[in-house]
Amino acid sequence: MKNGMAECSVCRSRLVSPSSKAISRAYDNYNYKIRVSSKQRALNVFLVVGDCMLVGLQPVLVYMSKVDGKFNFSPISVNFLTEIAKVIFAMVMLLFQARHQKVGEKPLLSLSTFVQAARNNMLLAVPAGLYAINNYLKFTMQLYFNPATVKMLSNLKVLVIAVLLKMIMKRRFSIIQWEALALLLIGISINQLRSLPEGATTVAVPIATGAYICTFIFVTVPSLASVYNEYALKSQYDTSIYLQNLFLYGYGAIFNFLGILGTVIYKGPGSFDILQGHSRATMFLILNNAAQGILSSFFFKYADTILKKYSSTVATIFTGIASAALFGHILTMNFLLGISIVFISMHQFFSPLSKAKDEQQNGNIELVDAKDGHRAKDSFINMAAGATEEASHRIESDDRVPLLPR
């Protein structure tokens, strides 16, 4: 049995296995359920560590970019420059990959390859547009919350992503994994609890309403973008990731440039200077955002969106400590308790015990399907053997099964 195909041990002919069912194109077609190799584990560790560093630094760099609580630059210009940096990286890596192609492989830089890949990856325009909206919201969220709180709120994306993965990509989660996600929400809620002193209960309604709206969009939009991005990258798995990134970042640059044009129309030609108000901190912010986006593409294609979001929760500790050390933000007991529950949730979600029952049920279902398929094929072969004297054999998923007597 290989890739849902049953192979005969004599003639090497292949047929689609009756028990193979396409649950999800993006997961099943590319061996998503195979045992994780040592190289895959090393890649996952590298992705998680890199993501923790980059995601943890982002809100700190955004906070450092503010002057008197405001941005002297246009956030859209930062997003546009970030996309340009990622496009340049994708082009350089694509040229490097093309120079090291093996003999007989289809050239990556040919016009036909580029056009065909562009047609097959048009779906990447959807997450690119959603990311353009989300990148602007990252700056807006800093006006309402401190960096550590922004990271805790972003953890809400895990639950939304899980629901979207179940709806769009038909991915299944065990009961223990759903309970782990519930624990994650509890941990985030504990962190958000604040005891206000007397006389401090009045909050400006426009600011509070704007914060809630931004939080809802901040959680929903990137979650939808991540799921569509993972589906688009995995559905065209044979396409070079750097070629896919070139399309994704190209779409993102176009959307952000349209945002700049809209700003020019609204504020006047003076706002067209995309470098206005930038500082050394914003340059580091652009490089950090570019590296984070590039790393995310490897998460979505070779790892998992849930792993990506859970790894971002680890960055909360780094963000909280850094914001406390650099900006004097206080690490409350609620924050420490919330972080503890988040880590318990992460351990429970990825624990082998959380997957054992689900995998056992799947194995039983596959075994029953295989037995039913074998009985059906046995009946058909016996009928054919009684009607003809010609040699015949049956194709089984197990090559050790002997051929029928002639």
From Swiss-Prot:
Keyword Membrane found = yes
**An MF annotation (GO) of this entry:** pyrimidine nucleotide-sugar transmembrane transporter activity
Keywords carried by this UniProt record? Golgi apparatus, Membrane, Sugar transport, Transmembrane, Transmembrane helix, Transport
Question: Is Transferase found in the keyword set?
Answer: no
Show the InterPro entries listed in the entry: Nuc_sug_transpt
Write out the topological domains of type Cytoplasmic. Answer: 1-41, 97-148, 194-201, 267-282, 345-406
Would you name any one GO CC term? Golgi membrane
Q: Which residues lie on this side of the membrane: Lumenal?
A: 63-75, 170-172, 223-245, 304-323
| Single biological process term from Gene Ontology | sialic acid transport
Membrane topology designation: Multi-pass membrane protein
Question: What's the stated role of this polypeptide?
Answer: Sugar transporter involved in the transport of CMP-sialic acid from the cytoplasm into the Golgi.
Report the protein name in the record: CMP-sialic acid transporter 2
